[in-house]
Every structure is written in C-alpha cells, then in structure tokens.
Amino acid sequence: MDLSALYYPYSHTLPAVYAQTHKLVAYNSIYNAFELYWLCVLPLLVLGVPLCLSCLPVRLSLPAKLGEKPLAASSRPEWDPTWVVPKHIAAIMDGNRRYGRTRYGLPLKGHQDGSQRVVDFMNWCVGAGVQILTVYAFSTENWGRAQAEVDALMNIFTSFMHDIIPQALERNIRVCVLVSDGAKFPSHIGSAIEKIETATAHCTAFTLNICASYGSRNEMVHTVQAIAAKVAAGTLAVDAIDEAVVSEHLLTKNVPDPDLLIRTSGECRLSNFLLYQIAYSELIFLDKMWPELNYDDFLHMMRTFNLRKRRFGK
C-alpha cells in the first residue's frame, strides 16, 4: 500500500505550521518586551533621573551666594568698569566675637582681626572709587557687656585710631568718630578721638566715619532736643522744620546718606544703626563673619548693588 498520499499533506503543512507558530512567538516576544519597557523601564527612568539629580550637592545647581567659601579662580568675579559705584557705604561689622571664639577660642582675638579688616575694606573702597565708609564699631547697647570685654574693646579702639593716622595722612583720608553718647567714654578715648579728627581734618580724598558709643535712637533724641531748643529760643520757626533741617542736626550732617548698607554674620536686622539715614539705602546681608570678608566678597557686593533698581519710591 502506498502511504505517501497519507503523509503528503502532513509533510508539507507541518513546516508551515511550525513557521507560522515561530512568527507568532516572535511577534509576541517583541510585544511583551515593548510592554515590559513601558510598564517597568520607563517609570524607572522617569523616577530615577530626579532621584539622581536630588543626590547632587546643592551648590552645584545653585549660584554661589555671598558668605560662602572663596570661589574657584575660574568663577571669581571681576571688576566691571560699567558698574555704578556707591558713593557712601555703611557697614555693620558683626560676628567678631563668634569668629574669635570659633577660630582661636578667644573672642577678643576676633575683634583684633576685625579691626584689621576695617583697613582692608577701606582700601577696597578707595580702590573702587567709593568716597565714604561708615562703620558701626561700638553701639550704646554694647556698654551692657562684661566690663572686662568693654575695657578690651576700648583698648583696641584706641590702638586702631593711633595706628591708622599715618596711613590716613599718606592717603589723604579723613577720619571722623560719630558719638551719640560720649558720657561713658574714658578721658583717654576722648583725647584719642580729638587727636585723629584734628590730624585728618584737612584730608579730602576719602572719609572714614567710625560710629562709637552710637545709637540711632539716641541720635534722634539729641536731634529733636537741639531743634526744640532753637524753636524755644525763637531762632527757628516750627513751620521751617523739614527733612533738611533734621538732617542738618544729625551726626552725619556733612555726608550724603548711604547708598549701600551691609551687615555680616548672617543676621538680618539694623540694630539701631543709621535708622534715619538709610531710608533708601540698598541692604545686603552676608553670611560671613566680618573678619572673614575678602576682596571677592567686596566684588559680589558691588555686582549685587548694580543689579538693584533704585527707584526711590518713584
């Protein structure tokens, strides 16, 4: 019996069935792989990228801000000749004690370093074309500190005024000491103040104002008293009192109001400093302690000042 006829359909159709089945399996594998990608791989990518980015250090994704460590040489700011230079800068030199305590274990050493930074900062101002620098050296509230600390601060203050006279005369810098309450000053402090002011009175290139035993509220009280005395004496009419008259009775009567006020140490308050004079000053608060400031920080201040839009209420 010829069995080839029986096997003929089988021998030809079976490979075709296998081939068709193979194609279906391949198609199903591709589909399953694509489906697996959408269900598993893609969510991992979507979630993984933000998670990876979140692990990067913040300072890699944010611009450097004032108060951080000195920038790398390639990122350091440079002086821009198109910048507008503030004529008058006021500085609250905060953080000396904390700096001295942290670095040396001696708060007083921080004040000594801080006095040197005044000279550095003044030199940066002179080089930039700033005309006036007013620094907050000792407030009326500082008299409430421990007597030993007050005595040490008075000694540093006296030494500073004595040591800076030669440099001030050489560079034509006038030094003025603004005192709103001098009753507690020892006599030798008063003599040192008179000496430095007299010695530099003729200097005109730059003015350094040192606020010592100063408080803005105390200054305003004396201003009101002086104006009231003139009204009582008949030399000043009440209707004639205006902002100009008030300014003429302030300790800063001979200088324009500050264009820029800075404060170091991360504190964001004015601490009874030039409250009347800074009505339209630009304010910059820095995280660094006063003795830590460097020239890069100064350039950052100038750049920040020039990014501000000073409208004076208009």
Give residue ranges: language-model regions.
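Flexible, compositionally biased loop and terminal segments
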Residues: 2-314
